[in-house]
From Swiss-Prot:
The gene is ccsA. The keyword NAD does not apply. PANTHER family: CYTOCHROME B_B6 PROTEIN-RELATED (PTHR30071:SF1), HEME EXPORTER PROTEIN C (PTHR30071). Pfam families: Cytochrom_C_asm. The chain crosses the membrane at residues 16-36, 37-57, 68-88, 97-117, 142-162, 249-269, 276-296, 310-330. It comes from Rippkaea orientalis (strain PCC 8801 / RF-1). Belongs to the CcmF/CycK/Ccl1/NrfE/CcsA family. May interact with ccs1. Keywords: Cytochrome c-type biogenesis, Membrane, Thylakoid, Transmembrane, Transmembrane helix. It is found in: Cellular thylakoid membrane. This is Cytochrome c biogenesis protein CcsA.
Length: 341
């Protein structure tokens, strides 16, 4: 089996594995009693990650350079990054909902690369002179890892909004599963909690397979309301987990994005004599940086938690895709891949 045949097998296999894994995670969410499904899902993501890594390694051997020279290779590197960050996020959160929302992203990326791109864009070709630099690996790989990390963090924020049904629930805990839960007006729902003799409220929840206790602030009985959309203790526990993990993952992706932009500026100065030329890709990279900088600023200095930062992070998901793919497919600028829908 030659390298080209191996690559064709691996790209289609990666797509099929991720498709099956996505269905397994969805089935696990629909039937939580089937404890084998989360294990199968995690194994599927790990196998897909290994398959994509083997594909990229094969491309490296075939072309003799780090496989990030065209859209096909960068898409699979992005999918590899998403699956790698997924495994980290799932281990941190111990929640199968991570796979429910991340596997569709990884599967969609591999489907686009393997099934939609023209054949001539999937073949390995010699590097153009401008890309024959050690900065190719430093700049592009770090940027792609930052995109993957920020996408996972953003999609977890979207999952938070879905779990909370868009309610302005304030999560005031710094550790996973131990926060206090309040809506915007500082009220909680009677159906969510059990009042203790001292006036505090205890909510028992089994959000991720184990029973935990969240102790809420002491409240006046007059503030207990039942007219708000019902959110169970399980949903609140899960929302707290998603909010916390999304914050941590974005906190990891933002420094990677910063390093990638700086490395790109240094490379641009070496290649073209200018650190910044307001190329469309550079402009959108700056916009992406500003969006997630605003998110982290709101979380760290303003103390935002819950719906408002989640909306900001969710908008960042779209911005990352525009920066990575939308600008490239316009066929303009130094970062264009020259292919149109």
């Amino acid at each position: 089996m030659n390298l080209i045949t191996l690559e064709n097998f691996l790209d289609n296999s990666s797509f099929l594995i991720l498709l099956l894994t996505m269905l397994i995670y969805w089935a696990g969410a629909a039937f939580p009693g089937m404890s084998i499904l989360p294990t199968l899902g995690t194994a599927g993501v790990a196998i897909a990650n290994l398959s994509i890594a083997t594909l990229l390694g094969s491309r490296w051997l075939e072309g003799g350079y780090f496989p990030l020279s065209n859209l096909y290779e960068s898409l699979f590197f992005l999918a590899w990054g998403v699956t790698a960050v997924h495994l980290i996020a799932e281990k941190m959160s111990r929640s199968t909902l991570v796979g429910v929302v991340t596997t569709p992203v990884a599967m969609g990326i591999t489907a686009f690369a393997a099934l939609s791109l023209p054949a001539d864009m999937q073949t390995s070709a010699p590097l153009v002179p401008a890309l024959k630099s050690n900065w190719l690996m430093m700049h592009v790989s770090v940027m792609m890892l930052s995109y993957a990390t920020l996408m996972v963090g953003a999609v977890l924020a979207i999952a938070f909004l879905i779990v909370t049904r868009g309610q302005d629930v304030e999560l005031r805990g710094s550790s996973v599963g131990t926060g206090s839960y309040r809506n915007k007006l500082g009220r909680i729902q009677l159906s969510q909690a059990e009042k203790t003799p001292d006036g505090s409220v205890v909510a028992m929840a089994d959000g991720n397979g184990s029973v935990g206790t969240a102790v809420l602030d002491r409240v006046d009985p007059q503030t207990l309301v039942t007219d708000l959309p019902n959110l169970s203790p399980q949903r609140l526990n899960l929302a707290d987990t998603l909010d916390n993990i999304s914050y941590r993952i974005i906190g990891l992706g933002f420094p990677l994005l910063t390093i990638g932009i700086i490395a790109g500026a240094v490379w641009a100065n070496e290649a073209w004599g200018s650190y910044w030329s307001w190329d469309p890709k550079e402009t959108w990279a700056l916009i992406t940086w500003l969006v997630f900088a605003a998110y982290l600023h709101a979380r760290i200095t303003r103390g935002w938690q819950g719906r408002k930062p989640a909306i900001l992070a969710a908008s960042g998901f779209i911005v990352v895709w525009v920066c990575y793919l939308g600008v490239n497919l316009l066929g303009k600028g130094l970062h264009s891949y020259g292919w149109f829908f």
